[in-house]
Regions:
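Classical Sec-dependent N-terminal signal peptides that target proteins to the secretory pathway
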Residues: 7-16
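Short helix/loop capping segments that flank catalytic or ligand/cofactor-binding pockets
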Residues: 77-82, 128, 218-221, 283, ...
Length: 354
């Protein structure tokens, strides 16, 4: 009797640390579905689906959740030893040299988690001849690219610790112009006080443009004129046959490429073109992609909270993928614009009435 009670006592003591009963399919059972080399492939190919990553500067991978970036905030000043009308003399040769200073402030890369969930019918999993990964991979890439781009451009679902979105920060610095503000699209973009000039006046050189798809038509409508003032029919913002006669045309603005994301990340009600010194934007990845297979979960719409999938009831599984990444625009001081509130390396071409 005492021996049975003792065994019961031991079981009660050990119960909290005994492994819980697993109601999900462990990772080992789906290794064929997500080979290790594909995890690296995702990280390598996400930039292809993200215009921010394509144009921005990729910093080294982060080893911690936060990385400090020292950013120059005060510039040194040089002084003449013998200024003004004073004639050089023995006394002036012994004059004290003036002091100057430099200063740095810290900006931070804060890595936040980005998740993608792909729901898959179990019937598809049972089909061993079906190349499931070939179907999942492009959708994962697309989802990562859209989410990151919209967070950077517009602050959509962005973590609170991340910097202000590009559009918000550019407008706060006065770096925006609306369609038709100068009376002519050419002047809006390239004229005095136009889109590109706003960035240049802040001490940065524009090296790329991210545009809404509708701007392609507007660009095609701007055509060169001949000596008689008549339009020749040649689009002035297209560099024809950039890669030879068989190559595709490339849209350029002031000699720098314009890209038109097809992933739906650009909201034309907020920006028609985002022009900037893109290497001033840096991003970094905290860790590679991780995976988990969900078998009996309920998937909800994050906005409406309505149930999108009931995996157990609908004979489905869901593959959840996660990665952690960060971005920042250090916006260092320069000689042309020393006021940080007025300085920003991006400008926004906004729709009329915005």
């Amino acid at each position: 009797m005492l021996k049975k009670l003792w065994k019961l006592f031991i079981c009660i003591l050990l119960f909290p640390i005994l492994p819980a009963f697993k109601t999900y399919v462990p990772r080992s059972s789906v290794e064929a579905l997500m080979p290790e080399e594909y995890q690296k492939e995702i990280v390598e190919h996400v930039p292809e689906m993200s215009s921010v990553m394509k144009l921005g500067y990729k910093a080294p991978n982060m080893s911690r959740a936060q990385k400090r970036i020292p950013c120059l905030s005060a510039l040194p000043t040089a002084y003449f030893s013998n200024p003004g009308p004073t004639v050089r003399s023995d006394a002036s040769d012994k004059r004290h040299k003036q002091l100057t200073t430099m200063a740095w402030e810290n900006k931070y890369l804060d890595a936040e988690e980005l998740n993608v969930i792909v729901a898959i019918p179990e019937a598809v999993l049972d089909d061993t001849d079906y190349d499931l990964w070939a179907e999942i991979k492009p959708k994962l890439l697309e989802a990562y690219g859209i989410a990151f781009d919209q967070a950077v451009y517009y602050g959509t679902n962005a973590p609170a610790i991340w910097p202000d979105s590009i559009v918000a920060a550019a407008m706060a610095a006065g770096n925006y112009i609306t369609l038709g503000e100068k009376g002519d699209l050419y002047d809006d973009l390239l004229g005095d006080g136009g889109l590109i000039a706003l960035v240049e006046e802040d001490g940065f050189m524009v090296d790329g443009h991210v545009s809404a798809m509708g701007m392609r038509g507007k660009m095609r409508g701007l055509r060169a004129t001949g000596a008689d003032g008549e339009k020749t029919g040649t689009p002035i913002f297209k560099s024809l046959y950039k890669e030879g006669m068989q190559g595709s045309t490339r849209y350029e603005l002031d000699g720098e490429e314009m890209i038109f994301p097809k992933n739906g990340s650009i909201d034309p009600t907020q920006s028609l073109i985002i022009a900037g010194a893109w290497k001033q934007l840096m991003y970094a990845i905290r860790k590679d992609v991780s995976w988990k297979l969900l078998t009996e979960a309920v998937i909800q719409d994050p906005v409406t909270k309505e149930i999108t999938y009931n995996l157990a009831q609908q004979n489905m599984v869901a593959l959840r993928s996660s990665m952690r990444l960060a971005w920042q625009v250090p916006n260092p001081i320069n000689r042309l614009q020393t006021d940080e509130d007025e300085r920003y390396p991006f400008a926004v071409f906004a729709p009329a009435g915005s």
